[in-house]
Curated annotation (Swiss-Prot):
Residues 1-20 form the signal peptide. The keyword Signal applies. This is Toxin Td8. It is found in: Secreted. The modification Arginine amide is found at R83. One of its GO terms (molecular function) is sodium channel inhibitor activity. GO terms for biological process: defense response. Beta toxins bind voltage-independently at site-4 of sodium channels (Nav) and shift the voltage of activation toward more negative potentials thereby affecting sodium channel activation and promoting spontaneous and repetitive firing. Disulfide bonds join C31-C82, C35-C57, C43-C63, C47-C65. InterPro entries: LCN-type_CS_alpha_beta_dom (IPR044062), Scorpion_toxin-like (IPR003614), Scorpion_toxin-like_sf (IPR036574), Scorpion_toxinL (IPR018218), Scorpion_toxinL/defensin (IPR002061). Belongs to the long (4 C-C) scorpion toxin superfamily. Sodium channel inhibitor family. Beta subfamily. It comes from the Eukaryota. The keyword Transmembrane does not apply.
Length: 86
């Protein structure tokens, strides 16, 4: 029983330390990755390429990813550099 409690404690501790983020996937040009003309599985495969858990083509017609690692770039309106913006 104590091993089980220890296991659960470690599990929750790891879950609190490992943080993931959600957001729009960013291309090399700083713009959101568009998916309007792509196949249905395109966003999910692009999100998994950067170690995200899942993704889909959102209403803005851009790939939205879930549970991406902190090092993965996501689109942010404050740091938007799409089409030369700063």
């Amino acid at each position: 029983m104590t091993r089980f409690v220890l296991f659960l404690s470690c599990f929750f501790l790891i879950g609190m330390v490992v943080e993931c983020k959600d957001g729009y996937l960013v291309g090399d040009d700083g713009c959101k990755m568009h998916c309007f003309t792509r196949p249905g599985h395109y966003c999910a495969s692009e999100c998994s390429r950067v170690k995200g858990k899942d993704g889909y083509c959102y209403a803005w017609l851009a790939c939205y990813c879930y549970n991406m690692p902190n090092w993965a770039p996501i689109w942010n309106s404050a740091t938007n550099r799409c089409r030369g913006r700063k």
